[in-house]
Each structure stands twice: as C-alpha cells, then as structure tokens.
Amino acid sequence: SFNGDGGLREVILGMGWRPFKPISLGFNASYLWGDYTHNMTMSFSESTAFSMARIYSAEISTYNLQAGFQFIQPINKTDKIVIGGTYTLGHDVNNDAYRKTETLNSATIETESIDTIRNAFQLPHAIAAGITYYRSDRLRIGVDFELQKWSECKFPNQQTAISTSTTPSSESYQALKGQLNDRTKLSAGFDWTPNPLSLGSYFNRCTYKAGAYYSKSYANADVTGTIKDKPYEFGVSAGITLPVANKNIWYNIPRINLSVQWVHTNIPYLNAATLRQSVLKENYLRFCIGVTFSERWFDKWKVQ
C-alpha cells in the first residue's frame, strides 16, 4: 500500500521599477517552507510472515529569487505590443531527506534503520518569455513559453542494483541528477470585450476569454531507460467575466468570473507484466467561479 501527505507554502515580496517609459523591471523574493511524508508498506496475509514499511520524509525551508522585465512598444494611440520575460535562480536547498525502514511482525517492530541524505534537493533555473498584443481596451492576444531545468537538479531516490552471477542485488538511497525531465509549457490565449462603455447592451460590456496550453512534465517514469515517450499534458479553457454594477465606467467595478477547462494527461510507464511501454491517460473538466469585489483592492503600492 502507498500513501503520502505534505506540501509547500510560499510567501512572496515583489517590487517593480520603471527606469524610463517603455521599460519596466521587476524583482520577486519569496520564502518556501513545508514537508512531505511518503509511506510504502508491503504486508502478507500469513500471520507468521514479516511485513516491511518504508517512510520517506523531509522538511523544506529555502528561498526563491526571480527577476523580470517588460517592454511596451506603442503601435498607435490605442494599440500596443508588450514583450516580457523572467528568470528564476536555481540553487541548492540545504535540507536533508530521510528514509526509515521497518521490519514488523504482527505486533511489534523487529528492526529499524534510518538513511539520511545531506543537502538532498535543488531548485531549477527557469526562464519564461511572452508577447501580448493589445487593441485598445477591447482585445488582448498573448503567447507565453516557459522552461524549467529539472534535469540538472538532484533529488533523493532509491537506487537498486540487479544481482548478477558474481554479485548480489543491492540498494541505496541517494540524491542524483538526471532523474527528472525538463519542464516546458507553451500557452496562448485571448480576451475580448466588445464595448467596455456600452450603455445599450450588457453583453457588450462582458469579457469573453479562451486559451490553450501544452506542457511536458518534469515527472519521469522511465526508471529502466526503455520508455521512449515523455509525460505531457494539454488543455483548453473558455470563460466569461460579468460586470455586476450597471455603470458608465469599466474600471473598479465588481465582477463575476466563470470558466471551464478541459485537461488531458498522458503518462507513459513500463508495464511490469509485459515489460513494454503502456500509457495512463486521464481527461477531466474543471469549473471555476470567482468574484472580484473591486479592482482597487489589487492596486499596487508605489514608492515615490
């Protein structure tokens, strides 16, 4: 049986600066903390047989640094193109990982051992870039690309050496690089408001949105080197933003956001029975609803 628990939390402090009109610079610093526990138990129906339990755990406490830029190129009085990019610093995470192995009979723990990996984790270097076309206050079309270099990060995992005619099988708990894949994501979308200041039609003041993305996961199920394909995911979404107040203004009014998203995941793995590649596929829908009471709540602080 398998079960697990845990997760990460993050607090972010960000600041932006516009040294001159077309260019803005930004910087984010964040603190990450959390933990995880993964339990694996192998038991047998015979009361005289010993069971084995393994508990993998760690506590994480580290920082994250990100810098970015934005360049605005006006086309005319109402239209413009915005180009942006970010870089996230990869670094060592100086936290340890633990593996506890227990051998149990029906009532007590017979043996117990703990393996420790010092400085077992790394965060990846990451870059992202995007371009957006603005047509007045009515239309936005954008494309984004993101790359995270997880293949260069070390991560704890159990390593097993298969027995040969001269050496018995063995296993160890190590933090090694190359166990994860680089993560990439390509996204595109648009939103359109027919007429933000329309007095004659409510639906002309609504904003209609749609988008799609394709992502290759950092997860790596190819433990034997025999799986050719990589895990991937793609999805499409659509939504509408409904202004609540019937006013002659567009900004700083309450809104209701409704959206639906369809997601497909494709995870190849090695079938233990046939020793051939199999694929785990999932399709699911997400329905989201959100309320913005007043956009003034989200005004950014400015340092004079």
Task: List each language-model region with its residue ranges.
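Outer-membrane beta-barrel porins/channels
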Residues: 1-304
